[in-house]
Amino acid sequence: MADIPPDPPALDTTPANHAPPSPLPGSRKRRRPVLPSSSESEGKPDIESESSSTESSEDEVGDLRGGRRRPPRELGGRYFLDLSAESTTGTESEGTGPSDDDDDDASDGWLVDTPPRKSKRPRINLRLTSSPDRRAGVVFPEVWRSDRPIRAAQPQAPAQSSGDRAHAPRRSARQAQMRSGAAWTLDLHYIRQCVNQ
């Protein structure tokens, strides 16, 4: 057996001078530029604060130009881009022509889905009239009626095939004539045919 030392250096729990843990890859914090006090500004300029301020402004410009945006806030189930957090510099907003913000939003995938507009169907107002008006030709004009006189005393003929559309207006007019004694009847099949023509 190998001899194990009683206090190996690997088990030493005293903290050594370690650097603080590095931040996670996505959570890089920007340093604020240090404002020089009045006594320091008279003497020499603060070189470190100038370099840190240029780094942070370059990071912001790089983030905006690279197409990266901050993730949207979620309020009540809807997503909103936090546009107040984004700042544009004077060089970007000067005379660059039309902005491509719409294209950037579409490529980033942060577009808010808007419901597609429903196309409105044309509204058709039908005037439904009682049977005396139907006989007078308000709903069924005289053009659609048959030329030969309608015989009301004849019993109704057996129903014709639905494929024969040439006789449909005659049949409807005949049925309207036969039902003229009824208080108020509708021939929905004929009305549909007239509307669809």
From Swiss-Prot:
GO terms for cellular component: host cell nucleus. It is found in: Host nucleus. Tyrosine phosphorylated. One of its GO terms (biological process) is regulation of gene expression. The keyword Phosphoprotein applies. InterPro entries: IE68. The keyword Ribosomal protein does not apply. Pathway: Protein modification; protein ubiquitination. Residues 1-129, 147-178 are annotated as: Disordered. It holds the Pfam family Herpes_IE68. Residues 62-76 have a biased composition (Basic and acidic residues). Residues 84-97 have a biased composition (Low complexity). ICP22 and protein US1.5 mRNAs are transcribed from two different promoters on the US1 gene. Functions as an E3 ubiquitin ligase and plays a role in the inhibition of innate immunity by preventing IFN-mediated signaling. Induces the ubiquitination and degradation of host STAT1, STAT2 and IRF9, resulting in the blockade of ISGF3 nuclear translocation. This is E3 ubiquitin ligase ICP22. The gene is US1.
